[in-house]
Amino acid sequence: MLSPKRTRFRKQHRGRMKGISYRGNHICFGRYALQALEPSWITSRQIEAGRRAMTRYARRGGKIWVRIFPDKPVTVRPTETRMGSGKGSPEYWVSVVKPGRILYEMGGVSETVARAAISIAACKMPIRTQFIIAR
């Protein structure tokens, strides 16, 4: 699972996901890509599940690039704990994804293989996505 090696601070504010993604919204490495259409937090487990699904389907052919990285810690309080006494401890990592962001890229395979592999990965995501091809 992906997570930062070290961070400056252990805990972060939740923040807001306003607007669309201006960075990371173009295909850079491969020929085919999976693009987010909704804003959401995507956990490191979901990213890894999508990557594994694509890798299994493509077998040895092709190359896969993961364009998002989970750099935001999400804190969770223990169950049946009263309010107060500070913020919970960091439990897992998420990537903040806005509409338009490229999640995965793929190259070195035919369009049919890429479309099938990316659609399997799209099923692992908690948001609506679309398959796009580089010009």
Curated annotation (Swiss-Prot):
PROSITE patterns: RIBOSOMAL_L16_1, RIBOSOMAL_L16_2. Gene3D superfamilies: Ribosomal protein L10e/L16. One of its GO terms (molecular function) is rRNA binding. One of its GO terms (cellular component) is chloroplast. Keywords: Chloroplast, Plastid, Ribonucleoprotein, Ribosomal protein. Signal peptide: none annotated. Pfam families: Ribosomal_L16. The keyword Glycosyltransferase does not apply. Its main location: plastid. It is found in: Plastid, Chloroplast. GO terms for biological process: mitochondrial translation. Belongs to the universal ribosomal protein uL16 family. Part of the 50S ribosomal subunit. This is Large ribosomal subunit protein uL16c. It comes from Calycanthus floridus var. glaucus (Eastern sweetshrub).
